[in-house]
Amino acid sequence: MSIELHKIYKRKKSDRDIFQELMPFKIKEILLIANYYDAYTIEREGQFTDKIVGEYLQVNLYTAPRFTSVASEAEALKILSERHIDLIILMAGLDKQTPLVISRHLKDLYPNICQLMLVNNNSDLAYFHTIEDRLYESIERLFVWNGSTKIFLVMAKYIEDKMNLDRDTHLGDIRVILLVENSIRYYSRYLPLLYTEVMTQTQELIFSEPQDNDMSIVMKIRVRPKVILATNYEEAVYVIDHYRENLIGVISDVRYKRNGEEDEEAGIELIRYVKRTGAYIPCMLQSQEIENTVKAEELHAAFINKNSPTLAHDIQAVSYTHLTLP
């Protein structure tokens, strides 16, 4: 009896230790750089900070990062000299040049701080596509404002998942969902939906199990699957090759770059690649062209119509059916 109790104690202690060691990189301090007009765009519908905290509480994340807003490079440099910052978010709206200039200057001075850019609307994306090479010298990823403060939660989680991926998958056998999408407009819509679905399923699993007083809900939330974004074929293959045993789903667009060129069959080839690995990994194909439904069926993959008026519901339904957490 004492041996069995010792084993149970050791297992629980081990689980608790692992939970505590997961997600070593946490975004606690975010510097938001936006001129007064762009800042007004996100603040006009209510208290920005309260809404951010609300988004975190909705998914049982009790500690939201602190946002510090500044309107100029000089103000940004002052904050950076005074305290540690985990993530810099630059807003770009009417003035698209100044955020780029600031970003490059900050990258030279603080190369280890991740920078993301948030543009005000979809119409601004065309301009940034023309300067991609310059943009990504200092900016990690571009997102588009979709009217919801949830995009800020997603931006923080995107960086956290990317930074913690290797360690957490090895330490805690954490699961991974791969989203392959090169459209800024669409991944800015998909990621909030995916994170919400992942957090909902994780909470359902946690609350369906006997509660262990030694491990808080907050700690258990750390075992949620990571959502990893790839924007081309090679990035996706890298994730599949390195984290195959952890993958619980691949959601892929059809058309994106492969070997540096736009490939109309890239998503099809990627799912074929997944199938050839021999691992059982549920796959979903997403496309604006409804005729790709047939190709998805041939690959035994689910299909999502990107032009569907019920896109949010469709993603939720398909994710629940095909990406149910183990």
Regions found by a protein language model. Name each.
Residues 69-71, 142-146, 230-231, 303-306:
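Short acidic-hydrophobic, aromatic-tinged amphipathic segments that line or gate anion-handling sites
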